[in-house]
């Protein structure tokens, strides 16, 4: 298989104010979690449902709640979008927090940029439901979209952070079953390493406003429990076989602690012959596309993503 790769580093810097919105939100969350170590899951979810705040409402996008494949979801429907092209979006939040509502605006921006529709899943969350429930919900939604008449190759699995993990795992699960999978996969700042390793967990610890090894350890315990191997490929795609995997677009912020989750993923996928694009946002935080509508870097990123998607 021929390997086609490109690596791009965003060269336009957003103004300080636009960048501070996301960094400051993360800093506020970190301060609250540090001051309230026994914060319950209900309050933690309420906190992370504010994730949409840095994102400007996308123009010309309407929303519709639905249930597909038994999974509650929100459709993001840009004016003039090709409804035969679907972005199956899995939200981030350590598999435990975040929701379709917290990611609605971000998914709407991406759909508008590429000219498709987005379908944001409210998959079952940990700790009430452990791995592989989240992957199963993603596959069920994928199957239902195909059953409705959407061609598998016209579906893109896409997600951020833990949702980026799921976007990859859904495609891996379908491939392992010998079934047609998505035509492409997109991962924003994917969180993949369930062993909680990585050089940038240390080197970017002082620049990442949200992610810490301790925070990740708690999320890992919630989703894997005592029974799931942290090296299981559908839980930790860094151990997956990427032979025959769809083309892949990955973004990460240069100052985030999970940066080398992305770079290790790209290395592994490239070694298997996957067509990979890696885009690193200089000076950007975890899931910096949340700055959509207020950041020149994100506008440039979405232009690159749209070109990649259409080609």
Regions found by a protein language model. Give the residues of each.
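A glycine/proline-hinged amphipathic helix-loop "lid/cap" segment
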Residues: 1-81, 310-311
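Hydrolase active-site cap/lid region
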Residues: 172-228, 244
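Short beta-strand element of the alpha/beta-hydrolase
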Residues: 84-93
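Catalytic nucleophile-loop/oxyanion-hole region of alpha/beta-hydrolase
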Residues: 99-100, 106, 119-154, 292-298
């Amino acid at each position: 298989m021929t390997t086609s790769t490109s690596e791009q580093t965003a060269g336009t810097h957003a103004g300080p104010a636009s960048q501070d919105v996301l960094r400051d939100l993360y800093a506020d969350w970190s301060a609250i979690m540090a001051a309230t170590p026994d914060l319950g899951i209900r309050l933690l979810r309420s906190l992370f449902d504010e994730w949409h705040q840095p994102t400007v409402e996308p123009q010309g996008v309407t929303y519709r709640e639905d249930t597909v494949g038994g999974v509650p979801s929100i459709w993001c429907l840009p004016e003039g979008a090709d409804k035969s092209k679907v972005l199956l979006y899995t939200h981030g939040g350590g598999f435990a927090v975040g929701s379709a509502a917290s990611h609605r605006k971000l998914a709407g921006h991406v759909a508008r940029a590429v000219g498709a529709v987005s379908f944001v899943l409210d998959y079952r969350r940990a700790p009430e439901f452990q791995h592989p429930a989240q992957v199963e919900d993603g596959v069920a939604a994928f199957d239902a979209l195909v059953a409705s008449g959407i061609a598998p190759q016209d579906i893109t699995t896409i997600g951020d952070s833990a949702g980026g993990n799921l976007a990859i795992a859904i495609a891996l699960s379908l491939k392992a079953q010998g079934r047609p999978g998505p035509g492409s996969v997109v991962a924003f700042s994917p969180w993949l390493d369930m062993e909680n390793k990585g050089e940038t967990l240390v080197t970017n610890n002082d620049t990442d406003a949200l992610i810490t090894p301790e925070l990740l350890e708690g999320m890992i315990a919630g989703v894997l429990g005592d029974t799931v191997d942290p090296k299981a490929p559908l839980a930790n795609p860094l151990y997956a076989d990427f032979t025959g995997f769809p083309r892949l677009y990955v973004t990460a912020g240069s100052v985030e602690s999970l940066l080398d989750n992305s770079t290790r993923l790209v290395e592994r996928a490239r070694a298997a012959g996957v067509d990979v694009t890696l885009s690193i946002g200089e000076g950007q935080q975890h899931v910096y596309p949340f700055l959509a509508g207020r950041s020149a870097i994100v506008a440039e990123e979405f232009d690159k993503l749209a070109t990649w998607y259409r080609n």
